[in-house]
Amino acid sequence: MSITRRSFLGALSGFVSFGCQAVCPNPDETFDLIVVGSGVAGLTTAVIAAESGIRRVVVLEKQPLLGGTSIICEGNWSISETIFQKYAGIIDSNDSFYEDMLIAGRRTNKPELVRAMIDAGRQQFEWTVAGGVRPTAVGVNSGLRIPRAHKFNPVEVISHLRQCAKKLGVKIQTAVRVEELLGNHNSGVLALKSSKAPTNYFTPNILRKSWSRLVV
C-alpha cells in the first residue's frame, strides 16, 4: 500500500475532535498519536501510522477485549476487480461497482466520493491481503448486482492487526474509557481524560511535534 507519512497525516487532520476546556492537567503519558477505539479502523490507523514513521502510538479501547463492533460484524468487504473474483469466475468492474453505489444512494451521493471510496477500499483490501489475511468466500451484498462481497473472519482480521501493531511497537490498552477531550480552539486537543488509574490523562505530543493528531 503506497502511503506517505505526509499523505497519511494529512488524512488524519479531518478526524480531530475535542471539547473546550480552559485548563489541561499535566499528562501521565504522552504519545505522538492517540487512537480511540480498537476496531478495524482504529487498529489499521495505528498500524499505518507506525509504518509511516510515527513512533509513539497508543490505542485505547473501553472494552476489556479488542475489536469493538468489528469483532461481531459479518465481515463482508465489497471490492471490485479482485483476483478472488477472477478465481471464482466472476466478471466485475470498478465502473459496475460505481454504478451500483449510485443506484443504492438514489443518485444523491457525490460521484467523486464514490470513486474515492472504491479506490481507497481497493488499496486497503490489497494491504490486508498482502499481510496474509484472505477472504473465505465471495458473495452478493444488499444493493449490489454482482458478487463482490468478500467474506472475512472478523476475529482473524483483528488478530492480524493486533500482531502487526505489536510488532511495530504500538501500545494497546484495554478497559480504558475515554471520558473527555481537553483543549481549546486555538491549540486543538491538549489532553485526554481516561477512566483508568493510575494513567488518568494522555496527551498528543503537540509541543514538540506539530503534526500530532488525535483520532477518535
Functional labels for PLM-detected ranges:
Residues 1-15:
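N-terminal secretory signal peptides and thylakoid transit peptides that target proteins
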Residues 13, 36-41, 66-67, 74:
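Short glycine-rich loop/turn motifs that provide flexible caps or phosphate-binding loops at active sites
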Residues 18-25:
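Bacterial Sec-dependent signal peptides at the C-terminal "C-region" and cleavage site
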Residues 27-32:
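A short, charged/proline- and glycine-enriched loop
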Residues 33-58:
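N-terminal Rossmann-like FAD-binding beta1-loop-alpha1 element of flavoenzymes
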Residues 56, 62-181, 186-188, 195:
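Conserved N-terminal/central alpha/beta ligand/cofactor-binding core
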Residues 182-210:
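Conserved beta-strand-loop-beta-strand element in the redox core of flavoprotein oxidoreductases
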